[in-house]
Amino acid sequence: MCKSRVHSFLQALPKVEQHLHIEGTLEPELLFTLAEKNGIELPNDPVYESADKLRERYGRFTSLDDFLHYYYLGMSVLITENDFETLAYQYFQRAAGENVRHAEIFFDPQAHIARGVSYDTVVAGLVAAKHRAQKELGITVELIVCILRHLPVPESHALVDTLLDRGHFNDGTLTGFGMVSSEKAFPPELFTDVYARVAKTGTHLTTHAGEEAPPSFITASLEHLKVSRIDHGLAAAQDPELLKKLAANRTLLTFCPWSNVALCNLPELADAPVREFLDAGVLFSVNSDDPAYFGAYVQEVYCRVQDTFNLSVKDWAWIVRGAVEESWCSEERKKEILKEMEQVLEKYKDLDA
């Protein structure tokens, strides 16, 4: 937790989390509990001897693919609707405790379907947790369904068939559509037709881009997939013209500075382009990505960013205001969160004096 003088301010800020993989909130303790409940045999690997050993291994990822190996192994314990509800609700409790007022969460149906767990099971559990969180915790939640880019494109079309058949793009179940997984070998253009089908429903579109691939992947995502948001966007800092375009179009980057360090996409947090984004007027939010695997939930990420960059109250106001304004909740909800933010800014305005 950060020790700066703005610590109380960061705690008080109403937050929106827009880059959060719900499967990435699976803490080792819950992993072991669900494995036992569901009779799932974990790998014969010393790191699976205890929650502490597994967590220690999570602290030594060497790449995105190294992380994904453990990420997909971890989710193998999620079997029933109640498992998904428990997973999500535990995250919502943690998030609400860190003053997250609105969360837009990713989930990966294809990874579960491949294990024999139906899309309907997954989404039912997440929707149940969403409704509980909104009723009991006062946090609003939207679901972003994601395709896995490392799988054959026809499998993504098959998932879209299911989503269209269920009517979930139109009945409020799903608010966004995104794409995740290994990036470099799977350029955005491969999925142009998949995204075009979803675009016809009016659903918000996003994709992971520029995490481990060059800026051209971000540009291609904007041009071919017609996304209104970029998840990560780290590589945008390498292209001044792209930064100008992102700023001019108010394209939000759901930035995850700590996970970029955890996966060795950045040598250290000080190398994150936080200042570059601020100076260019690029809208970005600060997010935790897969906090159970990277060891930092959103409050801790805020604090690490603050300790590294010594941002002003004005800087944080820019970050949070842009994130709220470009969120996918209702206009009424945006106004509520912005009002809360203005009250916090007024209380802590002397910090910039």
Curated annotation (Swiss-Prot):
This is Adenine deaminase. Substrate binds at D290. It is found in: Cytoplasm; Nucleus. One of its GO terms (cellular component) is nucleus. It comes from Gibberella zeae (strain ATCC MYA-4620 / CBS 123657 / FGSC 9075 / NRRL 31084 / PH-1). One of its GO terms (molecular function) is zinc ion binding. Keywords: Cytoplasm, Hydrolase, Metal-binding, Nucleotide metabolism, Nucleus, Zinc. Its cofactor is Zn(2+). Binds 1 zinc ion per subunit. The record marks H232 as: Important for catalytic activity. One of its GO terms (biological process) is nucleotide metabolic process. It comes from the Eukaryota. The gene is AAH1. It holds the Pfam family A_deaminase.
